[in-house]
């Protein structure tokens, strides 16, 4: 007869944290959000840690190289999507690893034969007022000039005016050679009172820009997540089919950590993938696995050698696995169960395997709840898809700016490898949807606000570290009426004519 779990399966929204004693030391500035990313033995330090407990999901509409850089600057890690060619994913990893903080690859480029109307259209598209003029209009073409808002007046110039007639030519520009350090570049900017400094190589080709506005920004990133060579950390998703070809390419490109991207991780296919990596690379290549929702699934992957285990099936905002297949578990219940298994595994073996809560995060406080329930960090998709740095397009929907967001199990992603059980026959139904999410601006502003809430709540619980939160947190289940009571009610909000 089938096994029935006792008790109901709960979501994060059904729990609240009960405040605890806060000492005078419990202030947000004293809170550390550092947390382990990969397995380690008792008494040792993990090979990789996060400075903030947030990683981005392995999704086409979420984790590209721009977002990977932006998140690493805040202290987290992006897992670049694997639903692309091996060459493209490896190139994406290489771009993140070669990125120099403060050196920006130009995404606003034009040829001298273009017109003022082209400049205006490009500015509208990118939001940037500095446009590089290269011979072929590419980001790495031979630099021939620059156009800023000071080079033209729309009211006094014809739209068809060629760029070459009003650009600032190369001979009148101050540039710096490739190899210039960030400190040297900033000194040039301040000495010559520049807003931007183009970096060019020996052939006169554009390499990057250094902007005055980025100087202070760089100083404001104390949580940057860097490797031993001062490069940003980056992760990448792999599957259980072409790993023998994909993993070596990603390792050669410099990837720091891998994750097997699958909607269901309690399988022979994940075991074979991890075993192949261990036989080929030993412990030098870090790889997470999942997803699972119970203790048995966790122990299976931990015994296989997974460096961390992802928890969650069907809880993502665009995931419909529960609806189409009837499998899954409430995210809060799954996290609690798996984290208990992790602690038991640690007591038995002396090996700590971090747990990643993947899915089910609707509100910022759900992150704190997941951490309090035992998760070491959370994986977010919808949250990051809203930002400028995500790969998807920004669109206007009925007067509201939105970003496109689709699941890896959707027809659009065509990533059947994530949802296959390993046979040769492809699945014929979808486990994800294609959708929009409200545009929310820059990643940095939003992440800092979210983490400010996490730190504040931790102080309310009397905790200065994530481990301390897990030890001191007191949680209570709430009724549906309590959830309503917790929001605004019995007033008319100024942003609406409807009573709430």
Language model segments and positions:
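Catalytic cores of alpha/beta
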Residues: 66-69, 243-253, 287, 292-311, ...
């Amino acid at each position: 007869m089938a096994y029935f779990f006792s008790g109901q399966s709960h979501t994060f929204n059904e729990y609240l944290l009960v405040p605890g004693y806060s000492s005078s030391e419990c202030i947000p500035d004293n809170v550390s959000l550092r947390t382990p990313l990969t397995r380690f033995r008792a008494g040792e330090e993990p090979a990789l840690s996060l400075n903030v407990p947030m990683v981005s999901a392995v999704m086409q509409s979420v984790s590209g190289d721009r977002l990977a850089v932006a998140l690493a600057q805040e202290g987290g890690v992006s897992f670049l999507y694997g639903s692309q060619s091996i060459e493209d994913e490896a190139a994406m990893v290489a771009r993140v690893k070669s990125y120099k903080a403060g050196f920006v690859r130009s995404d606003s480029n034009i040829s001298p034969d273009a017109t003022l109307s082209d400049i205006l259209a490009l500015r509208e598209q990118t939001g940037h007022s500095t446009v590089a003029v290269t011979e072929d209009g590419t980001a790495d073409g031979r630099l021939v000039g620059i156009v800023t808002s000071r080079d033209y007046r729309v009211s006094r110039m014809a739209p068809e005016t060629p760029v070459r007639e009003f650009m600032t030519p190369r001979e009148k520009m101050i540039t710096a050679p490739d190899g210039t350090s960030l400190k040297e570049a900033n000194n040039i900017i301040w000495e010559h009172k520049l807003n931007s400094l183009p970096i060019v190589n020996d052939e006169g080709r554009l390499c990057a820009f250094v902007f005055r506005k980025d100087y202070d920004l760089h100083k404001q990133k104390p949580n940057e997540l860097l490797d031993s060579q001062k490069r940003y950390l980056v992760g990448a998703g792999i599957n259980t089919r072409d790993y023998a070809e994909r993993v070596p390419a990603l390792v050669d490109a410099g990837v720091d950590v891998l994750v097997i991207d699958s909607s269901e991780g309690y399988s022979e296919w994940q075991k074979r993938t991890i075993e192949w990596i261990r036989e080929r690379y030993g412990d030098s290549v870090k790889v997470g696995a999942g997803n699972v929702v119970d203790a048995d699934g966790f122990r299976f992957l931990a015994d296989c050698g997974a460096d961390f285990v992802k928890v969650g099936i069907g809880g993502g905002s665009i995931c419909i696995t529960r609806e189409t297949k009837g499998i899954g578990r409430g995210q809060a219940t799954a996290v609690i169960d798996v984290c208990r298994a992790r602690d038991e595994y640690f007591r038995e073996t002396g090996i700590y395997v971090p747990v990643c809560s993947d899915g089910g995060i609707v509100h910022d406080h759900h992150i704190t709840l997941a951490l309090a329930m035992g998760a070491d960090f959370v994986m977010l998709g919808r949250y990051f898809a809203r930002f400028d740095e995500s790969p998807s397009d920004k669109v206007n929907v009925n007067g509201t700016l939105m970003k496109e967001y689709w699941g890896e199990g959707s027809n659009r992603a065509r990533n059947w490898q994530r949802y296959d059980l390993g046979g040769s026959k492809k699945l014929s139904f979808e486990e994800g949807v294609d959708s929009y999410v409200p545009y929310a601006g820059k990643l940095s502003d939003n992440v800092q606000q979210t983490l400010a809430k996490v730190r504040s709540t931790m102080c309310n619980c009397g905790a200065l570290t994530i481990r301390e939160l897990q030890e001191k947190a007191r949680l209570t289940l709430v009724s549906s009426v309590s959830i309503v009571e917790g929001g605004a009610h019995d007033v008319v909000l100024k942003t609406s004519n409807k009573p709430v």
